[in-house]
């Protein structure tokens, strides 16, 4: 019997090794680190020494019957992100002697959760922080939550007459809605609403910029972009507003060049074009007051500070400086007052505060044991594989001859393929085919155990690592909790939240609970590149192995779906105290199976009754005892009240 054990790389694994492996010092933005116990720590804000132990927090939440998978939102990090955004603009305003203010709004579409929006409004109140809405439903949220009469409510999206009427009348409540014209036909609807209501709204225009964008959302600009008015349409809109005596309500220019802009040069070009449009609108007689630079402020998911899709080649301060300086230059060249600057920086505000935690249910990998059979009657193909295996064993502890190893590996693959052909033709039994596959894995493990990382990553050998990798079964639905991983191949930082004093000598990826081959996490950050396998620990018997997915606060909950009927996870809002302790502020309980089924018009009572009728028939036919029927119904009723995830 031959045993193949995972290859340990270091004798004394340190926290520094874990930091290097998972690059937490690069993407963590000082909010996340590893403590002396080998657990992830979460910091109150980037200037604070106050931290809490994330692993300890999750265990204590479990003792409260708040199980994984769960989302933990750190209110202090959310507050710090809002403060950091305003501090950056305040510094830029002071540096460039800008003669107006920055007044941000949060795009509700990034995270519509009530507790989140209430905190954003609370934390942003010193700066009259407002909201941006893109539908009538979001408009109603904004009108209900925004009580500060100095806060702005930017009204974007498609607008029918009712949308416009609601926003217009809300102005009489002391609210500050600005209706942004994004489609040309909205002009007539605004004019009709004004005539019907005898009330006027504040008006803005979204410009369809010609400046090129970058990244996944580059089509947000250009002639074929979904929203915005072309320059000729802007000119005709100004003419129509003048004819309707509404030009004095025209106050804002808005543009948006896409989400998660990675290259600061793209932002600069757009700012220059938009600033000049703002100047021209002023010259055309509009009493302009605001310029809304939209979203696009990116965050550094992979920590490389580059212009890749998962990073940014600029800092928050760089961004604020360029916004302030560019708009100032355009206005001063034309003797125009500096406008109030608005941004819709959703991802940069909300991403860092949310961490998704899940537990590993189990693992699968190729067999680690092999018994070599020396049978003279066995197939020649099998004999060839055995001979290849022994040739590889002879190379153990000898000077590595990489070309020879590659040749032997190619031989092993060819012999395995020959076995498959023979099996299809009926010349090889199922047992022989299984033996051939085990021998091929054995060859792969011999090679892996004899080579270092650089050697095993040779293009002709890299598939060995993939072959030997473990699949870690994750107690979550990717489609529900991190849909961007599936939909657009978004990369989030992923790592264990504990055991960082131990070497993670296994390599693996994650499979979720859904019956879908797309339900896999197999793309991980790797010094600016993407790797398909993550260093992981061997799960311990009867102990949770907990994994964190970081920076998930934007869009994921709104976009998540009910694939295979996995519902909302537990959500917990945490305040970090000054004494390294915490306070649980809010708990939003996970969906039960009954609640999920109700969304699809299934009555739990009807389902149970239908099954009960079946059990009665089975009892009559002597297929089921009364005791078995009762037990089945009891289990179903209990299950309906429980989570859709595996926490029972």
From Swiss-Prot:
Q: Determine if Ribosomal protein is one of this entry's keywords.
A: no
Reactions the enzyme catalyzes:
L-arginine + H(+) = agmatine + CO2
Question: InterPro entries in the record, alphabetically?
Answer: Ala_racemase/Decarboxylase_C (IPR009006), Arg_decarb_HB (IPR040634), Arg_decarbox_C (IPR041128), Arg_decrbxlase (IPR002985), De-COase2_CS (IPR022657), De-COase2_N (IPR022644), De-COase2_pyr-phos_BS (IPR022653), Orn/DAP/Arg_de-COase (IPR000183)
Q: What is its EC number?
A: 4.1.1.19
Keywords annotated in UniProt = Decarboxylase, Lyase, Magnesium, Metal-binding, Polyamine biosynthesis, Pyridoxal phosphate, Spermidine biosynthesis
- Record GO terms (molecular function): arginine decarboxylase activity; metal ion binding
Report if keyword Metal-binding is assigned.
yes
Q: Which residues carry this modification: N6-(pyridoxal phosphate)lysine?
A: 109
Q: Which Pfam families match?
A: Arg_decarb_HB, Arg_decarbox_C, Orn_Arg_deC_N
Q: Which cofactor does it need?
A: Mg(2+); pyridoxal 5'-phosphate
**Which CDD domains does this entry report, sorted A to Z?**
PLPDE_III_ADC
Copy the pathway line from the protein's UniProt record: Amine and polyamine biosynthesis; agmatine biosynthesis; agmatine from L-arginine: step 1/1
Signal sequence annotation: none
GO BP annotations of the record are:
arginine catabolic process; spermidine biosynthetic process
Annotated substrate binding lies at 291-301
What's the superkingdom here? Bacteria
What is this protein for, i.e. what is its function?
Catalyzes the biosynthesis of agmatine from arginine.
What's the family? Answer: Belongs to the Orn/Lys/Arg decarboxylase class-II family. SpeA subfamily.
Could you tell me what this protein is called? Biosynthetic arginine decarboxylase
């Amino acid at each position: 019997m031959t045993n193949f054990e995972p290859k340990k790389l270091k004798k004394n694994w340190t926290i520094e090794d874990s930091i290097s492996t998972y690059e937490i010092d690069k993407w963590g933005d000082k909010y996340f680190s590893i403590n002396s116990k080998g657990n992830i720590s979460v910091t109150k804000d980037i200037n604070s020494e106050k931290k809490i132990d994330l692993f300890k927090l999750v265990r204590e939440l479990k003792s409260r019957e708040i199980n994984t998978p769960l989302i933990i939102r750190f209110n202090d990090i959310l507050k710090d992100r809002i403060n950091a955004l305003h501090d950056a603009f305040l510094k830029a305003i002071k540096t460039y002697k800008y003669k107006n203010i920055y007044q941000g709004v949060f795009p509700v579409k990034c995270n519509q959760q009530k507790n989140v929006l209430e905190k954003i409004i609370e934390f942003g109140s010193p700066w009259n922080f407002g909201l941006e809405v893109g539908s009538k439903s979001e408009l109603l949220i904004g009108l209900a939550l925004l009580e500060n009469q100095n806060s702005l409510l930017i009204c974007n999206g498609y607008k029918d007459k009712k949308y416009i009427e609601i926003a217009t009348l809300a102005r009489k409540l002391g609210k500050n809605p600005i209706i942004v014209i994004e489609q040309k036909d909205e002009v007539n609807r605004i004019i009709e609403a004004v005539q019907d209501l005898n009330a006027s709204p504040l008006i803005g225009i979204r410009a369809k910029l010609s400046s090129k964008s970058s990244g996944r959302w580059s089509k947000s600009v250009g002639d074929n972009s979904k929203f915005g008015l072309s320059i000729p349409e802007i000119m005709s809109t100004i003419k129509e507003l003048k004819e309707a005596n509404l030009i004095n309500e025209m106050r804002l220019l808005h543009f948006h060049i896409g989400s998660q802009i990675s290259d600061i040069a793209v932002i600069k070009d757009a700012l220059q074009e938009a600033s000049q449009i703002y100047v021209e609108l002023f010259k055309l007689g509009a009493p302009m007051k605001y310029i809304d630079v939209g979203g696009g402020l990116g965050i550094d998911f992979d920590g490389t500070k580059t212009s890749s899709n998962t990073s940014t080649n600029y800092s928050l301060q760089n961004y604020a400086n360029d916004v302030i300086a560019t708009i100032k230059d355009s206005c001063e060249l034309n003797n125009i007052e500096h406008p109030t600057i608005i941004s819709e920086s959703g991802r940069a505000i909300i991403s860092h505060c949310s961490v998704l935690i899940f537990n590993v249910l189990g693992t699968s990998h190729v067999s680690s044991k092999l018994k070599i059979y020396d049978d003279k009657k066995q197939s020649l193909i099998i004999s060839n594989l055995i001979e290849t295996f022994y040739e590889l064993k002879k190379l153990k502890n000898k000077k590595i001859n990489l070309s020879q190893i590659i040749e032997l590996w190619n031989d092993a693959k060819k012999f395995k393929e020959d076995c498959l052909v023979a099996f299809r033709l009926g010349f090889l039994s199922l047992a022989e085919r299984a033996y051939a596959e085990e021998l091929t894995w054995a060859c792969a493990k011999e090679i892996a155990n004899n080579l270092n990382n650089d050697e095993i990553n040779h293009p002709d050998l890299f598939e060995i690592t993939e072959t030997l990798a473990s699949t870690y079964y994750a107690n979550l639905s990717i489609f529900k909790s991190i849909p961007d991983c599936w939909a657009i191949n978004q990369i989030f930082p992923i790592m264990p939240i504990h055991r960082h004093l131990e070497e993670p000598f296994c390599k693996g990826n994650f499979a979720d609970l859904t019956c879908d081959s797309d339900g896999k996490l197999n793309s991980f950050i790797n010094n600016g590149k993407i790797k398909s396998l993550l260093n992981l620990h061997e799960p311990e018997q009867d102990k949770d192995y907990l994994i964190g997915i970081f920076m998930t606060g934007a869009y994921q909950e709104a976009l998540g779906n009910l694939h295979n009927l996995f519902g909302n996870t537990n959500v917990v809002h945490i305040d970090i105290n000054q004494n390294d302790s915490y306070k649980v502020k809010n708990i939003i309980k996970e969906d039960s199976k009954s609640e999920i089924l109700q969304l699809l018009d299934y009555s739990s009572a009807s389902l149970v009754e239908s099954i009960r009728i079946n059990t009665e028939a089975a009892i009559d036919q002597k297929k089921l005892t009364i005791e078995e029927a009762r037990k089945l119904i009891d289990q179903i009723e209990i299950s309906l009240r429980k989570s859709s995830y595996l926490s029972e």
